[in-house]
């Protein structure tokens, strides 16, 4: 189960169908986070049928990215993901508008029907006269170039993510990760030694987190390195294979 069974994501009919299927056929369910399991159980699923095995990323794709570099006087920040209101790119723009030491790169494309939001983001940048510090780049399957460019990676979703794959990718790249404290993300950054969590939609807290990094770069280089070590240890593919194999071997 890789998505949260909530009314925000699925119709009541779809949720009921999934739950009834697991009950009728006594289906064992693997959830990609405790948050996903909680949503499954809250929707009527049987907790005993559901086991949490946290998701994973191919760490080999990120390990050759150069070490973090704070690029002189600037803090290069990357926002990566679909251009959509719930992804919270506007929150990031608002948070950095008065931080003259920040350069922001927003990578992603708008889905069909969400061009208005993309235009809104561009207008924000224009209204705040941030064209020299904020750039937009289209969606790309190769994100290594963007991760190499940045020193800080921001995940700013205003709605809970079932897991938070991009958070793990930022950690694997050895970047300082600031992420939203909701959904499955706190299961990834479960200690302040590995990254920074901020409340969803909280511009003030996000602004403070960015400023804290700028004022103590040495401290947050350590955080970035510890985050990378944790991501390799807990969220790489060999770990996932081991956990699933163990789970299958123990099924009765």
Cite the ranges covered by each PLM segment:
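A short, well-ordered alpha-helix in the C-terminal region of glycosyltransferases
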Residues: 205, 212, 219-234, 240-246
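A conserved mid-protein helix/loop that constitutes part of the nucleotide-sugar donor-binding site
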Residues: 75, 82-98, 116-119, 204, ...
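Carbohydrate-associated surface elements
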Residues: 35, 56
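Short, structured helix-loop element that forms part of the nucleotide-activated donor/catalytic region
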Residues: 36, 41, 105-131, 219
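Active-site donor-binding acidic/aromatic loop of nucleotide-activated sugar
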Residues: 113-118, 131-140, 146, 196-197
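Conserved acidic donor-binding segment of nucleotide-sugar-dependent glycosyltransferases
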Residues: 191-192, 196-203, 212-217
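Acidic donor-binding loop of glycosyltransferase active sites
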Residues: 148-162, 175
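Short hydrophobic beta-strand element within catalytic cores of glycosyltransferases
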Residues: 176-179, 189
